[in-house]
């Protein structure tokens, strides 16, 4: 049974007890007078559900729902390519914020700000994007996947433009932080949801390719920002980013079209929170958010403090992003074979062990580079599986709401993660190993997230066995 058919049968379990469901492939709606034994040929690209129920008068009524199975290719691949570009230009710069942070703290606002304060800029960007995920999903459901993201692209571009004129740290909090974060929140939903509508058997591959846009973007934007800040100043770097984001994201969005899976999509209500798997999965997203951005924000500064050159620090950050891309590639290639839960568990194992066993025991360039690579591999694989796993566990109709909820809770984690790490770093500077507490603070939440996903897998096995 395919993933979509499993989702349909899962949805049928939520119908009233007096409703029996049967699912079979057909080309058109059948009339209610047609007998069950009619001989028809059904093409492979449509699936219909026949619902039989008894009303109060004891009369039998048939209701029919037609499901258009995803084509698993065709125009869907163009949707994947454009979604990749949307992720690259809208979310890629978030992974590259460490370069801006180092410049703001050590040059532009030197002596007038701290790591903890400036890290709030990147945190507000990432957390606003994520926390507003549910709102973005609901808005896209109501107004479509064209109008809402276009508003987001305009806000995102405007945020970078206004940030270029910032003369105080709090100006950056409002522009590069909040405004860019809100813009990204409204922009990224089509890239996460729409490709999954076009694929069933290859859904893991398709969504994985899309999510690689962040990893590729992190690599390119890190080097791009580092080079341009030195050549044309941070202000003109931000202005150029504003123009590039506006043009590239708009062109990509114009080619992203939705594929309606059902004639009447199932509405997802808050009663879904009664599902233990959903609660555990969302808890995992929160703790992932707490940990995941800290290394990207603090690796350049950490490298400088242990004697690595400025260029070496940027290289470590770039290699971490390159490893993130590799992790996304590997996870994407094997996702449909091993399944998203197994891939997610492997990703959490890599991130946890890299922080607690590698980063905590190294104090040189080579060891830090090794940590960045191993952590990047695990981190990259983590976020490739979100859409595929939600579709597998809860159905395609749940994607807008549950993907939004996932990123909302991850955003709350983002909001706490790097700023608290900055405070910890400031308080432990007098220690013999000032970064040790920060490393432990980064590693423990990732272990908790790993445990949550293990429990999701066990709960899924128990549910299937029941």
What is the role of each PLM region?
Residues 1-73, 458-466:
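Intrinsically disordered, low-complexity terminal tails of fungal membrane proteins
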Residues 104, 177, 184-199, 206-207, ...:
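Intracellular juxtamembrane helix-capping segments at the cytosolic ends
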Residues 131-171, 335:
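Conserved MFS/SLC helix-loop-helix module at the cytosolic interface between two early adjacent transmembrane helices
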Residues 131-145, 229, 327-340, 358, ...:
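Helix-to-loop junctions at the C-terminal end of transmembrane segments
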Residues 154-167, 253, 349-363:
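C-terminal ends and interior cores of transmembrane alpha-helices
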Residues 306-308, 312, 318-324, 329-393, ...:
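C-terminal transmembrane helical hairpin of 12-TM major facilitator-type secondary transporters
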Residues 89-104, 222, 275-342, 387, ...:
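Extracytoplasmic gate region of multi-pass secondary transporters
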Residues 82-84, 88-89, 156-160, 169-190, ...:
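Hydrophobic core of transmembrane alpha-helices in multi-pass small-molecule transporters
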